[in-house]
Amino acid sequence: MMLFLIHLMALCCMFVAEVACEQFNSTSNSSSAQSSLIDFQYKGVSIGGWLVLEPYITPSLFNATLSSGETWTDLPVDEYHFCEKLGAKEAEKRLTDHWESMYNETDFKQIKEAGLNMVRIPIGYWSFEKLEGDPYVSGAQDYLDKAIEWSHANDLKVMIDLHGAPNTQNGFDNSGLRNLGYPGWQNKTEYVNHTYKVLQQMFQKYGTGKYASDYKNTIIGIEVLNEPLNPNMDKLKEFYIESYNDGREIQVINNTIFFQEAFQPIGYWDSFLEKGEIKVTETSNGTNHTTTKKADFKNIIIDHHHYEVFTESQVASNVSTHLENIKNYASAIGKEKAKAIVGEWSAALTDCAPWLNGVGLGSRYEGTAPYTNDRVGSCAEFNKSPDKWSKKQKKDYRRFVEMQLYEYSTNSQGWIFWCWKTEGATEWDFRALVKNGIMPQPLDNYKYVKNGTDTSSASAIASNKMTLLLAFLLVILVI
């Protein structure tokens, strides 16, 4: 009987070990076909809140606009209204101080030391050419040029990202002009044509001459527009074709041109990139004329953005659900025909960072206006200094970060974290996450994720199975 039990226990241990091994070693092969296409594996970070203001990244800039007797209702909600409130002279002074102080070459050295190999630098159209009547001030372009030099000196690639278009392409404050729910970029041909004009200037400056010769191995490409929301898709496709053709005609270097997904489903852009054409109907003198716009797309990357905090169901999810969401999302990208990156993601498990949703707006996590969902919890636990976070909080964040690092690296051409640093929004702050042991160093130094499996969860499953088996053995012994 004893010999039988020993054999049974050995078999049980082998079974549990096999279960754990299967869980730990499971991996997706969906990117194997894509891997041969990869020329450069992106491990990057966005320089957010610098050349295009975002209130939650640098709230001090916005708070400093208040005069005696004013309240938060008098705060500007974006860069457009920041400049309008202060006037051109004062806005230029404050923005120049901001551009000078927020980033310098030391930051780019630290970015390299953190294991990153590229930066994505957002900039607005107004930094190249304003529209008549715009309150924006110029000057940020000079700091983009400095950032390219700093990147070159520290062996970092640069993606230049047109983050704001005239009359806002998405209504978000990160476009320069907040008008939630009412992006107006496509409302007038003038706005789209002005965007073409700005892109042509960008292609001319950064794709020819000095930059083409001295920085051709630094400037990896240009993203023609960030996050267009609810556009007329045929018009957006026309814009992508025309922008691409301008880029290839003007530039003397064959760098990458990035198309942002425009919040479309994964795989949406595959057929468009394969066909490289769109039929366009124009009206002239009361008569409709249909033409076909074409492009021979080469060296295109689709830029996907993914966050887990901008719906009520997401902020109510537990960490295990978030991890499963990431696995499913990345697996779908791995099946895309187009080359793709996850060009924005973060460590955020809540939308608690003050002003993340916009100046004067609350959070889904707390169910505060304008959100009407049930309260999930208190933001105080997440907005306190990360050195005061509990061990469980830090572990959960690290599990979430590790899963994204692994899955995006495995199933796409890489990733770009949003963003390098903030004044206090830790979930969005790569530098702070490194300092607090949440962002792995080196970047593949995973504690909890092994080959795409959350081992903390897998260990619990194996432990529970072992407990049940041992209980079964004890019953046999008693019998």
Swiss-Prot record:
UniProt GO MF annotations: glucan exo-1,3-beta-glucosidase activity
Propeptide: 457-479
Glycosylation sites: 25, 29, 63, 104, 187, 193, 254, 285, 288, 318, 451
Gene Ontology terms: biological process: cell wall organization; glucan catabolic process
InterPro entries for this protein: Glyco_hydro_5 (IPR001547), Glyco_hydro_5_CS (IPR018087), Glycoside_hydrolase_SF (IPR017853), Glycosyl_hydrolase_5 (IPR050386)
Subcellular location field: Cell membrane; Secreted
Enzyme Commission (EC) number: 3.2.1.58
Family membership noted in the UniProt record: Belongs to the glycosyl hydrolase 5 (cellulase A) family.
Name of the protein described by the UniProt record: Glucan 1,3-beta-glucosidase 2
Gene (name only): EXG2
